[in-house]
Amino acid sequence: MNPDLQKERAGASFNPELLTNVLDGSPENTRRRREIENLILNDPDFQHENLNFLSRSQRYEVAVKKSAIMVQKMRKFGIADPAEIMWFKKLHLVNFVEPVGLNYSMFIPTLLNQGTTAQQEKWLHSSKGLEIIGTYAQTEMGHGTHLRGLETTATYDPETQEFILNSPTVTSIKWWPGGLGKTSNHAIVLAQLFTQGKCYGLHAFIVPIRELGTHKPLPGITVGDIGPKFGYDEMDNGYLKMDNYRIPRENMLMKHAQVKPDGTYVKPLNNKLTYGTMVFIRSFLVGESARSLSKACTIAVRYSAVRHQSEINPGEPEPQILDYQTQQYKLFPLLATAYAFQFVGAYMKETYLRINEDIGHGDLSELPELHALTAGLKAFTSWTTNTAIEACRMACGGHGYSHCSGLPNIYVTFTPTCTFEGENTVMMLQTARFLMKSYDQVHSGKLVCGMVSYLNDLPSQRIQPQQVAVWPTMVDINSPDSLTEAYKLRAARLVEIAAKNLQTEVIHRKSKEVAWNLTSIDLVRASEAHCHYVVVKLFTEKVLQIQEKSIQAVLRRLCLLYSLYGISQNAGDFLQGSIMTESQITQVNGRIKELLTAIRPDAVALVDAFDFQDVTLGSVLGRYDGNVYENLFEWAKKSPLNKTEVHESYKHLKSLQSKL
């Protein structure tokens, strides 16, 4: 064990195990998660060579092999709970993506949300055991987030009671679905439904694409892999072209909308119900942001405690780089953000499950806010995490650039989150639509509830300098509750600015669509401010729920740092709205420095509490034992280029040196 890490752990103010229990939800959840992790980590069937040293084709084959073993093991161990399945799936390939991932994250949830009981009975069991391997084919070459622009058609033929699927243009070819290229034999295809001469918009269809037994593409289906990408080497993201391809009427998912045998269309109770899978996956992605950022912080903080460099006091030993204030300023706000997102992710999961249950009972009242919240928080957390992972990599200096650090892989695996399941700017604009509707409701005399209830105060308060001039004296920069109020005022102010600018443009332009585009920068800023407020509010509420004093104390420091750092980075908003004064912003910056010093002794313990095992972390720099340099050398020696002392390519250089 590295003596620096021993010293760090001995000097912590709290027991990391207690904080791990908080993150997992309970001590029992921690015990069970570790039990499942150990089933994999101690199983020789799941051991494999370092994927960094394999070709893309080899990496894909390893991933498929491990996925097949995973299903067999889940049956053997009786793992059926959705949360436990998720834990098991995350570990069997460690830090790499799995080709069958969309079968579990998109295909099965869509079947559950949009399929009838009969359809679930037909396909669900087979898909859980990978007899049917499904993917989710929504995105096309020409359209992604703009769902109404999708061009794939499904035309109903009442004579044969079949749908005829077509990819009428090059841009209508399905493009990007994970597992589509080589792995899947079925796809849930999103297509424009035509029946009785009319288009009824996007609907979901179960489409067999490969023959069971031979795995060959079926007649009328053209399918393949789209080629190498920035990351995701193990994933066969694919394309799908359909030419007059027929499927039975029963293959349309009909829990909500239906097409009768004669072609009569029965519309759903609520059009938003068909977007259930997207809402589910976006709520899940908030937790993924937290997990990826927590990994990056663990690596960067541990390495910063092990690495010694330069000098603070001349003649003294080189200090740990974690002792430099600039390193703390790079990493500790990100560590605080990781904890904030952990709690927001747990909240989103609980909220989705609760509202989904209400929807099942016919109560759709909270669906609009759930849609807006999942869209906005998906964008807010993934944008932040994407930038933060790269900041962690650069905080590790040159070694962070090596794949041995684990950070490049975390980055390239996470960064697609900013564009898949809804491009982030568009997601923010979807949240903005909900905010504008809520603003209009308030101004028509109605009250709004949920996370936007702060807008109810607008008509009486008006976010204007002369009427909130007393506010600065009320801000307590040491009170998470007071800071939450400051974020609330900022959100209200930016929502009102966006709404007023939108109204002005509507009057001038006469077109709501053009006005929306010309106000879109303000609308995105309003959504970001709303999401930032939600994160601060949820973090603050979580801290108050903690009973153990040592845990509450360290989380309170992180909560304060997260809130104050956000104010520092967005000082203009707080100053322009007269929410805070210039002297208070100066105090905020001073308090941030104090918090860096206060968090420093607990930094290693805080990342230990995330409880990532070394195999899960996949990093030489972030090893639990801190023995970085010895293992860095061992890792390098495994490079395939080192299998020979003289590489075969030397023949090209030898002729140039023959005259020397």
Curated annotation (Swiss-Prot):
- Name where it's found: Peroxisome
Which residues does the annotation list for site: Cleavage? V468, A469
Motif segment (Microbody targeting signal) = 658-660
| Residues that hold FAD according to the record | T139, G178
Tell me the active site: E421
What cellular component GO annotations does this protein have?
peroxisome
Kind of enzyme, top EC level?
Answer: oxidoreductase
Phosphoserine modification sites are S26, S649
Q: In which pathway does it act?
A: Lipid metabolism; peroxisomal fatty acid beta-oxidation
> Does the record carry Lipid metabolism as a key word?
yes
Does this entry carry the keyword Acetylation? yes
Q: What reactions does this protein catalyze?
A: a 2,3-saturated acyl-CoA + O2 = a (2E)-enoyl-CoA + H2O2; hexadecanoyl-CoA + O2 = (2E)-hexadecenoyl-CoA + H2O2; dodecanoyl-CoA + O2 = (2E)-dodecenoyl-CoA + H2O2; octanoyl-CoA + O2 = (2E)-octenoyl-CoA + H2O2
EC number(s) from the headed UniProt entry: 1.3.3.6
Principal location: other
Q: Which domain of life is it from?
A: Eukaryota
Q: Which GO terms describe its biological process?
A: fatty acid beta-oxidation using acyl-CoA oxidase; fatty acid catabolic process; fatty acid oxidation; generation of precursor metabolites and energy; hydrogen peroxide biosynthetic process; lipid metabolic process; prostaglandin metabolic process; very long-chain fatty acid beta-oxidation
Record's keyword terms, sorted: Acetylation, FAD, Fatty acid metabolism, Flavoprotein, Lipid metabolism, Oxidoreductase, Peroxisome, Phosphoprotein
**What GO molecular function annotation could you give as one example from this UniProt entry?**
palmitoyl-CoA oxidase activity
According to its UniProt entry, the function of this protein is described as:
Involved in the initial and rate-limiting step of peroxisomal beta-oxidation of straight-chain saturated and unsaturated very-long-chain fatty acids. Catalyzes the desaturation of fatty acyl-CoAs such as palmitoyl-CoA (hexadecanoyl-CoA) to 2-trans-enoyl-CoAs ((2E)-enoyl-CoAs) such as (2E)-hexadecenoyl-CoA, and donates electrons directly to molecular oxygen (O(2)), thereby producing hydrogen peroxide (H(2)O(2)).
What protein family does this chain belong to? Belongs to the acyl-CoA oxidase family.
Q: Quaternary arrangement and interactors, per the entry?
A: Homodimer. Interacts with LONP2.
> Which protein are we looking at?
Peroxisomal acyl-coenzyme A oxidase 1
What is the species listed in this Swiss-Prot or TrEMBL entry? Bos taurus
**What gene does the UniProt entry assign to this protein?**
ACOX1
